[in-house]
Amino acid sequence: MTISITADDRELHVTPQSLLASLEKLSAIAAIVLLATIMLASGADDADLTQDGAGNNATRSSGTEWQNASETVASGYVGAPYYYRSDFKLKRPNGTDMTLKRMGWDGDAFYFPIDGGARVIHWTGSVGYMIDFMHNKAIARLGKGAHGRKIKNGVVEDVETTGTLNGKPAPSPLHLTDLFDRMEFTHGHNVLLLSGLVRFAPITAKIRPYLGIGFGASVPHVEAWFTGEALDRRTNEYQYAGPAFQILAGLELRNGRGSFYLEYKYIWSSIEAALTGGKSWSLKDLKSDWLPRWFLEPFSGLTEMPGDLWRQFTRWRSGEAPPEGNFATTLSSHQIVIGGGYVWPGRATAGAGAVQP
């Protein structure tokens, strides 16, 4: 049996098997995150106890001490985005200047690296700010999964177009695989955001709602391969691509020093990417007589994003035009994330909430 779901002119084909597999993966990941945070939180419970004048441990309060607390929370989360359609504008020096209308995007949340993020929040009473780095995947509908892997029942989309392709009127509708061999952001539709938060009065001693809005930058890993073109014309690199913002609402559960949350996010980002015909820079590309390759290899992946962004900056500074052209689109998504982390009390309130016997 196959269930078809249509929303905003987007059709999804969901089988009971695929839905069950996705739920099992999400449950397993959430369980690992929650278990790890519970272990950290329980290990810190004794640190939260204060002593009275006789040296006896005092009991902690039921959790109401967080109402006006100054504290810092570091956490990680997992999620799966639902993308909306968007126009895709492509311009290349071969006479291509076209718009692909309302292209669809899919995620591949549980293919490594798993979709999610990491963040740090500093609260001062009921207001706070958050630095949030989020990694999701976004893949054009070419009948493939992340990194071009084979998937069952893959859908190749036909889209309406305007403009020119290779100097001639673009065909409309266009079968996407006639243009792209790969068009995706699978090492990340990455966004880095600074958000302002407000948390409301606790619903219970341990559960508290919050809202937030944030602005930042999109830093996707652009993978753009065109059908029939040589390997050295493929773009595979991180780029600063434009502004991004998010709106969020969630519920936080406290257990000792543990912070667990269920959160809704709406994320929008603008992507204006250069088609450079290059791959990500890493330490493996460094020619050195005094740094052996066995030393460089373990750190090579960590240098790809900063190396690519530095190359992008030098191209911008020199006025160098991308040799293969450029494209522009937007990505907007809804998602529910599940996460957990650890709470560090602020100095002024580290002993707050202790109850004398």
Question: Which residues are covered by each model-predicted region?
Answer:
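Residues that define the transmembrane beta-barrel architecture of outer-membrane proteins
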Residues: S70, F112-G116, T186-L192, I207, ...
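Bacterial N-terminal signal peptides
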Residues: I29-I38
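Gram-negative (and chloroplast) outer-membrane scaffold detector with strong preference
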Residues: I121-F226, W344-R347
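Short glycine/proline- and aromatic-enriched beta-strand/turn motifs that initiate or cap beta-hairpins
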Residues: G43-T124, W290-P357
